[in-house]
């Protein structure tokens, strides 16, 4: 699977699991995304896909690296629907 395809799948999963914030952008907590069974089956390296999407300015989140447990409450915001 190529990175662009995984990023597009990630956008769909954020839209499925997330909700709109005050600015009208879709947000989801990292823990919700990480612990979702469907996401676990789709993404071999979820954190790598998140970093690739962040570099492409498709999503935004605080920090550079998200770790399970430690960063479960970090918001991932979809910048491009």
From Swiss-Prot:
Gene3D superfamilies hit by this protein: Costar domain
Gene Ontology annotations of biological process type: regulation of actin filament-based process
Organism domain of life: Eukaryota
Family note: Belongs to the costars family.
Protein name per UniProt: Costars family protein ABRACL
């Amino acid at each position: 699977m190529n990175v662009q395809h995984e990023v597009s799948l990630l956008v769909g999963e954020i839209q499925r699991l997330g909700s709109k914030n005050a600015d009208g952008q879709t947000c989801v907590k990292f823990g919700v995304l990480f612990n979702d069974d469907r996401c676990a089956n789709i993404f071999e390296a979820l954190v790598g896909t998140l970093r690739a999407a962040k570099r492409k300015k498709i999503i935004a989140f605080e920090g550079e690296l998200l770790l399970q447990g430690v960063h479960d409450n970090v918001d991932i915001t979809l910048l491009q629907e």
